[in-house]
Amino acid sequence: MKILVCAPLQEAESKKIQEYFINDTVLIKRRPTQEDIDQVDVIVGNPHLDLNLNQEHLQALLLNSAGSDQYIKEGTLNKTTKLTNASGSYGIAISEHVIGMMITFCKNLKTYALQMKEGNWLPSKQGKEIYHSRVCIVGYGDIGYEIAKRLKAFDCHITAIKRRVQKELPYVDEVATINDLDTILPQSDFVILSLPQSKETIHIFNRDKLLKMKKDAVLINVGRGSAISNEDLIEVLNQGYLYGVGLDVVEEEPLPATSPLWSYDRVLITPHSSGGFVWQSVRNYYTELVIRNIEHLKNHETLENEVDFQTGYRKVVTYKK
């Protein structure tokens, strides 16, 4: 088997894959050429879409991203090619980022950081507590699961929004669907988006949904920037709504320097950095996932995290224990 690794792994992880599949040909190349693509059976990573990936010989594409929307478009891959995403890899890193944003807003850390530059000792007279708060997590895959797991340490009441209602989910007090948002948003102190991109999720948080939220709620997006309408968010912020907005993803990336979103004291923007291969937990999990899936492929077994080309979601969702 010929395996191409173009994922942004470090030398240790790349070497681990090479050593595990010592009897196979493993090519490590961050920027593969069309000639490379034309010769391999498996691609590990997200190859550039300018390359022709629609190849009958390509057995599997093992993405290093949780999202797969660019690769499920008709004609991008051959119908015989299996596609998997990296769900499970990012949850730990992103959940820490979310908690950090929540604490930053609740304890006014951004305000104090700005005051430090001026040598200004001015205690804030407002704040929020995460303890005993009501949290709505929209999109309960691995990232939502890891967020909920950590928030349980704060004794939060957690509502998970999924496509389909399930009787029980780990670390969740209540399970609902998108259709229930109008009822749940007015009750939620924190709303956290960890959605993949699909036709149904684009601008799901428009003016109507944003105004359904508590006026002093905190909104955080670590899923896809397209889930929130920037134009509507700016309008709502100008009306004095929302205590804080944490954005690790936005509609247009990088966010233009001219965007009004940069100017709000109660908005915290990070450059799509909550998850990524800089984090050891991400690299470790993804490397093990890749090894397992190549073994599954060789043994003609079902692949983990296989993507449904119709929905863009995983065919089977499992949660870590």
How should each PLM-predicted stretch be described?
Residues 165-260:
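Rossmann-like adenosine-cofactor binding region
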